[in-house]
Amino acid sequence: MTRVKRGYVARKRRKNIFTLTSGFQGAHSKLFRTANQQGMRALASSYRDRNRRKRDLRRLWITRINAAARNNGISYNKLIQNLYQNQILLNRKMLAQIALLDTNCFSTIMKKINE
């Protein structure tokens, strides 16, 4: 049986792992086995947290809208219900930005809803 030299393939695979873990501390970026484990863990965490970020931002927007709505004397769920009934198409991100940066505009929207 002939000898198989697979240095290039193995080196390429290891290099990809070390590139992924280049900013990690200590053995997590120096030793292949621990770097491989930490790289897989980092990729799994980043995948999970991309969806978690969307969830967290939506919660933040709802909290901001609720606070601004209660300052105008209405609860969050009544506000959303009235927005749909009056066919005002503003998503939660835009409503939160308006509530945070332009309270006069938000008050105008509230008056439009309550008519």
UniProtKB/Swiss-Prot annotation:
It is found in: Plastid, Chloroplast. GO terms for cellular component: chloroplast; ribonucleoprotein complex; ribosome. GO terms for biological process: ribosomal large subunit assembly; translation. It comes from the Eukaryota. InterPro entries: Ribosomal_bL20, RIBOSOMAL_L20_CS, Ribosomal_protein_bL20_C. One of its GO terms (molecular function) is structural constituent of ribosome. The keyword Plastid applies. Pfam families: Ribosomal_L20. Keywords: Chloroplast, Plastid, Ribonucleoprotein, Ribosomal protein, RNA-binding, rRNA-binding. Binds directly to 23S ribosomal RNA and is necessary for the in vitro assembly process of the 50S ribosomal subunit. It is not involved in the protein synthesizing functions of that subunit. Belongs to the bacterial ribosomal protein bL20 family. This is Large ribosomal subunit protein bL20c. The gene is rpl20.
